[in-house]
């Protein structure tokens, strides 16, 4: 036998790097893609010779910060909670020919988004609010917030309605869409982003980490190969 030292053996390769991503089945994936697809469709349908319309996508703090990763690549800015709304206002004043989208989750909407929206309406900013409503505070552990209908002690109470809050602030154009209905989302984004002023699209679908699937598996016995999977 030939003695072999540990130094002569092949080193164990490092594990491949896997960047953080949105969960498989996360409705935020669909919401981001709908806005991306809407802007692509807008530019595809422009008359020949017309300059393409550039979209600016202002992100925020939450799971949806991961919208910055490819292939979505839909977060141009991320500073702090609520900043996606206020940063879009400032940039829109300097480059008004672009279309501005401010992404904010339902939890961040209540925690830090309201003051920025009030300011946007009052100062007649031109931007599209994309409220990603998954009915929880997903990133930090699924804590309740005023839109969930449950207090921090677990008591069931009446939800604070996001649409009514927006109406009270003065947002004129508000629509709730199924975040997983791509066609509906794309058409709504195209329609709303062309309007003047502050407008809001509420992309609603539950967080995949808390929803229980209604699909049931069954065995087709005459095709079963006993694979145990």
List the predicted regions and their residue ranges.
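Short glycine-rich anion-binding loops that position phosphate/pyrophosphate groups of nucleotides
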Residues: 63, 205-208
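Structured core elements
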Residues: 22-25, 34, 56-58, 101-103, ...
């Amino acid at each position: 036998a030939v003695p072999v030292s540990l130094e002569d053996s092949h080193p164990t390769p490092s594990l491949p790097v896997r960047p953080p991503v949105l969960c498989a089945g996360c409705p935020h994936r669909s919401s981001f893609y709908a806005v991306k697809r809407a802007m692509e469709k807008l530019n595809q349908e422009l008359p020949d010779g017309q300059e393409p319309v550039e979209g600016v996508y202002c992100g925020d703090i939450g799971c949806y910060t991961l919208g910055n990763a490819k292939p979505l690549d839909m977060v141009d800015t991320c500073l702090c909670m609520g900043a996606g709304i206020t940063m879009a206002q400032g940039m829109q004043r300097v480059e008004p020919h672009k279309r501005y989208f401010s992404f904010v989750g339902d939890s961040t909407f209540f925690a830090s988004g309201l003051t920025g929206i009030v300011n946007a309406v009052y100062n007649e900013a031109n931007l599209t609010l994309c409220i990603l409503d998954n009915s929880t505070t997903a990133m930090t552990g699924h804590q309740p917030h005023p839109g969930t209908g449950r207090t921090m002690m677990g008591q069931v109470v009446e939800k604070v309605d996001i649409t009514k809050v927006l109406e009270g602030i003065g947002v004129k154009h508000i629509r709730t869409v199924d975040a997983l209905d791509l066609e509906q989302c794309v058409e709504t984004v195209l329609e709303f982003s062309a309007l003047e002023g502050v407008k809001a699209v509420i992309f609603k679908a539950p967080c995949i980490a808390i929803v229980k699937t209604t699909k049931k598996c069954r065995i087709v016995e005459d095709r079963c190969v006993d694979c145990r999977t």
